[in-house]
């Protein structure tokens, strides 16, 4: 029996504050709630889901590299380099089939994350909780959208479900 397709869900800076940060924009659903609902949906679709959140660009880039089987360079010691992964036992060779990424503010600034995604060749869906096009002008540009398989924004937490559903039902790996 084939192993389930493996999806990596990456959340960028400040998304750990969902549920408390600007609830008038982002709502009251926490990142933990989103991850739990995503795990349930992924399981029902026959997908394996790993979640990862970091406020640090380099950690996100390293995790994207790791998703393709590349071993990241040893991290420099830093007390602020915390990142969270909800699945134990991930190794450098634990490749994924697709990535769902909410890059947060790095959407508008990170050529490094763009290059990491392109360098691995892993298809990805870009997700945003808020409608970035209805917000400040600096949020209207994404360094990822033109290379994403799909872009979902403004659907609140449901955007993650829509991305998983698309990957599980419609994308061929």
UniProtKB/Swiss-Prot annotation:
What is the recorded name of this protein? Answer: Catabolic 3-dehydroquinase
Question: What CDD domains does its record include?
Answer: DHQase_II
Lineage: superkingdom:
Eukaryota
- Protein source organism: Neurospora crassa (strain ATCC 24698 / 74-OR23-1A / CBS 708.71 / DSM 1257 / FGSC 987)
Named from the GO MF annotations, one term is: 3-dehydroquinate dehydratase activity
Lineage, opening ranks: Eukaryota, Fungi, Dikarya, Ascomycota, Pezizomycotina
Presence of the UniProt keyword Lyase in the record: yes
Q: Which cysteines are joined by disulfide bonds?
A: none
Q: In which pathway does it act?
A: Aromatic compound metabolism; 3,4-dihydroxybenzoate biosynthesis; 3,4-dihydroxybenzoate from 3-dehydroquinate: step 1/2
Q: Which residues are listed under the site Transition state stabilizer?
A: 21
């Amino acid at each position: 029996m084939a192993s389930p397709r493996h999806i990596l869900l990456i959340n960028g800076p400040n998304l750990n504050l969902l549920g408390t940060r600007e609830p008038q924009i982002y709502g009251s659903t926490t990142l933990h709630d989103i991850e739990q609902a995503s795990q349930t949906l992924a399981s029902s679709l026959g997908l394996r889901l790993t979640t990862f959140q970091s406020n640090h660009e380099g950690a996100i880039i390293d995790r994207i590299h790791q998703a393709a089987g590349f071993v990241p360079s040893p991290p420099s010691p830093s007390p602020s380099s915390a990142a969270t992964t909800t699945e134990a036992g991930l190794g450098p060779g634990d490749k994924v089939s697709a990535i769902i990424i909410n890059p947060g503010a790095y959407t508008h600034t990170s050529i490094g994350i763009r290059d990491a995604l392109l360098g691995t060749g892993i298809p990805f869906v870009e997700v945003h909780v808020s409608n970035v096009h209805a917000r400040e002008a600096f949020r209207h540009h994404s360094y990822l959208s033109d290379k994403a398989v799909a872009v979902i924004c403004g659907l609140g937490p449901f955007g993650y479900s829509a991305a998983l559903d698309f990957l599980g039902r419609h994308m061929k790996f």
